[in-house]
Swiss-Prot record:
GO molecular function: 2-oxoglutarate-dependent dioxygenase activity; histone H3K36 demethylase activity; histone H3K36me/H3K36me2 demethylase activity; histone H3K4me/H3K4me2/H3K4me3 demethylase activity; iron ion binding
Name the UniProt record assigns to this protein: Bifunctional lysine-specific demethylase and histidyl-hydroxylase NO66
Organism encoding this protein: Culex quinquefasciatus
N-terminal signal peptide: none
EC numbers for this chain: 1.14.11.-, 1.14.11.27
One Pfam family in the UniProt entry: JmjC_2
Biased composition (Polar residues): 123-137
Renumbered residue ranges of the record's region Disordered: 1-168
Length: 648
């Protein structure tokens, strides 16, 4: 039998000074409406056509973008300047590759193209019966590891040859609401979860093609079985800790083990500091013991035997189980999903008390570890945006929760929750900390929004461009902050009225695009099923003819059906008077190893992308795309691994 400690109900008095708020549990979220992916294709197309009609009526909100240059020069990594003659703009990569045709750079009147897209959406519905194979990929992407891609197609953007940076994705744990001083724990009895033969196939039951739904199923597995995703998000997310005690030591066993760690160290060039830390916390002193160079097994295990903790900063790069979990969860959360693992010997502690800037999910894999959680000390530390320094035991107060995790258990706590953990006598500990929502708050969005909104407002409002009063400095600043003169009060009213002019709905779109663009750089490359690989560029078959030609055996026609590989695989962004299509199929499993990947497209090609985004996970025949050179457009996306394609 497993027990799931779910809800920290009755708040106990806070023994520390009353500097924090009392966080009440949120009401369960209302059931969401069916997503477009769950509706019939006809309903989806009708809905999109109505949206296009409304957009056409609201002409004042659509800007006419100036035409962009047909080509531009960019320096490659060796410092040479190259001019791309291809209709696809890119920053040059090192080896010269065949030209990718299809996407020109030219911004035109958006309203005309919206009308074209609306007609194309109607055409998709009309041709639905004619396209016999519009349902692609019978199973979700459940776990074949992505092989190294061959560089046979021309990159549409430049992937910078940036040296691998020091990995910053360290164990961080996201902030949490203010004082939740728990006491009573509701315990539910559940049958023991049956052992899963392979972690890579446990979510295949729904058969969904929507990558967000597949990610939701993976998250349900992480927090399950007795609490649903909706219940968790309504009652615990960013509010208070959540504990699951499963009594199932095999639940997370396929993620990693000491044996897999040893194999990883032997077969890969794991470096101290960049990939792995050796730490200790003794008598109130936190130390890092990293030597230089490669972390070889004899040295790492010697540190471990001496009582040091081992922290791996990017296990998803080397361990397939962790990679499979993270790559699915990033689709659900639509933000960077990181992981660290921590291996701690018996009777020891590796880290001082602290809080982190991420939402933390602790997945206990081996051994036992005793955890202590503490409320944020002040209101400003609730859902903290920056991780804390190390604290002394005297600075953190009394624990709100103490628990010993055993294999198969889960502990979640929001950012800002102070925590520390140590192994118990006679038991080592191995756990994975999965982290999400770093720098993904409303404040982070508004930091992107305000510069755009202010710039736009200054163009539209003369009052914002007028000069400030000559005597403004005599009424504001530290020296004058306690003044209550009539002039100061009038100026405050004036400034408030100017701030009111800054709001811009268009700037919200720009800011969200920039946030989503950041995700494209942060994201792990997608994990493909065998069937997906066969229908993408990664599984392309070529004929090696006696005459020396190497033709592609996959024929693209207007009856070929396509769809995006993942819901969040691309983001169309308007920046620098150019439409750019950011994507992450060419990312490395190592965080920010390369510069962001993007294609530069014209308005015609952008409408084709917009159609694919809006009908996902449905497919569309190439002949129904609202672009001029339909087949070349589809090939350009296919060559970058962005779509799956199925012939007649």
């Amino acid at each position: 039998m497993s027990k799931v400690s779910s809800i920290f109900d009755t708040p106990a008095p806070d023994p520390r000074p009353a500097t924090t708020e009392n966080g009440a549990a949120a009401k369960p979220a209302a059931r969401k409406k069916k997503s477009p992916a769950a509706a019939t294709k006809k309903q989806l197309i009708d809905q999109l056509i109505r949206e296009m009609s409304q957009d056409e009526d609201n002409n004042d909100s659509v800007d006419q973008a100036p035409p962009a240059k047909k080509s531009r020069k960019k320096a490659d990594s060796s410092g040479n300047n190259n001019t791309s003659k291809s209709s696809v703009k890119d920053k040059p990569a090192k080896p010269k590759k065949p030209k990718t045709a299809g996407l020109k750079i030219k911004l035109q009147d958006h309203r005309k193209h919206k009308e074209k897209l609306r007609k194309s959406l109607q055409g998709v519905e009309n041709s639905r019966q004619a396209a016999a194979s519009t349902s692609m990929l019978e199973a979700s992407f459940n776990g074949d590891s992505l092989k190294d891609r061959s560089n046979h197609s021309t990159p549409v953007h430049h992937k910078g040859a940036k040296a691998a940076k020091k990995n910053k994705n360290k164990s961080h744990i996201m902030p949490l609401p203010l004082t939740f001083t728990p006491s009573k724990v509701v315990v539910k009895q559940e049958p023991k979860t049956p052992r899963r033969p392979t972690m890579l196939n446990v979510e295949a039951s729904s058969g969904s093609l929507d990558s967000v739904e597949i990610g939701r199923e993976k998250f349900s597995w992480v927090i399950g079985p007795s609490t649903t995703v909706d219940e968790f998000m309504a009652q615990f997310w960013e509010k208070k800790p959540f504990l699951v005690q499963r009594n199932d030591p095999t639940y997370y066993a396929n993620l990693l083990s000491r044996g897999k760690i040893d194999e990883m160290l032997r077969n890969n060039n794991i470096e101290y500091t960049k990939n792995l830390d050796v730490t200790s916390y003794r008598e109130g002193v936190r130390e890092t013991h990293n030597p230089d160079g490669r972390a070889l097994p004899p040295d790492v295990w010697a540190f471990y035997e001496e009582g040091c903790s081992i922290r791996m900063l990017n296990p998803q790069t080397y361990l397939p189980g962790v990679y499979e979990m993270n790559v699915k969860l990033q689709e659900f959360f639509h933000c960077m999903t990181g992981s660290n693992f921590y291996l701690t010997p018996p009777n020891s502690q590796g880290f001082a008390p602290h809080y982190d800037d991420i939402e933390a999910f602790v997945l206990q894999v081996e051994g036992r570890k005793h955890w202590k959680l503490y409320s944020p000390r002040t209101a400003s530390e609730v859902l903290a945006r920056v991780s804390s320094p190390n604290f002394t035991q005297e600075e953190i107060g009394v624990p709100i929760l103490e628990v010993t995790l055993e294999p198969g258990d889960l502990l979640y706590f929001p950012r800002g929750i102070i925590h520390q953990a140590s192994t118990v006598p006679g038991h080592h500990s191995l756990h994975v900390t999965m982290s999400v929502y770093q720098k993904n708050s409303w404040a982070d969005l508004l930091e992107l929004y305000l510069p755009h909104a202010l710039s736009q407002a200054a163009e539209n409002h003369l009052e914002l461009r007028r000069g400030i009063p000559q005597d403004l400095h005599q009424h504001f600043g530290i020296v004058h902050s306690d003044n209550e003169t009539p002039t100061r009060k009038d100026l405050i009213k004036k400034i408030k009225s100017l701030v009111d002019k800054i709001f811009s709905e268009e700037a919200i779109d720009v800011a969200v695009d920039q946030l989503a663009k950041r995700f494209q750089h942060d994201a792990l490359p997608p994990l493909l099923t065998d069937q997906e690989r066969a229908q993408t560029a990664y599984g392309a078959n070529y004929a090696f003819n006696p005459d020396g030609t190497v033709p592609l055996q996959t024929a693209f026609t207007e009856r070929t059906t396509i769809r995006l590989l993942r819901r969040n695989i691309v983001r169309l962004v308007n920046e620098e008077n150019t439409l750019r299509l950011y994507y992450h199929t060419e990312n490395s499993r190592e965080y920010h190893e390369y510069e962001p990947n993007f294609l530069e497209v014209d308005q015609d090609a952008a409408l084709g992308v917009e159609l694919l985004v809006k009908i996902y996970p449905e497919t569309v025949a190439i002949g129904a795309l609202p672009v001029e050179d339909k087949v070349e457009f589809a090939k350009s996306l296919w060559e970058k691994g962005l779509i799956v394609a199925r012939g007649e």
